Amino acid sequence: MSVGDETTIFDFGNQMPKDIHDTLEIVYNALEEKGYNPINQIVGYLMSGDPAYIPRLNDARNLIKRHERDEIIEELVRVYLKK
């Protein structure tokens, strides 16, 4: 196998999902309070990594930057699929 053919495995151990959940709740509420579409803004942040999608209101920007974007996506998929 060549170097690019191997599957990389991510293991986040026992990352506290509640912590990510709480962060997303705060971010969602801050976005709503500012009058933005929270889903579009969060997706924009997760896709681009640009923190400008998230407001500073209620420290939402700093809170979401505490988590790696791939950890947030993993938790969203896990909760969506109930796994």
Swiss-Prot record:
Annotated InterPro entries: IreB
Coiled coil (UniProt feature): none
Superkingdom of origin: Bacteria
The family this protein is said to belong to: Belongs to the UPF0297 family.
Annotated protein name in UniProt: UPF0297 protein LCK_00468
Organism: Leuconostoc citreum (strain KM20)
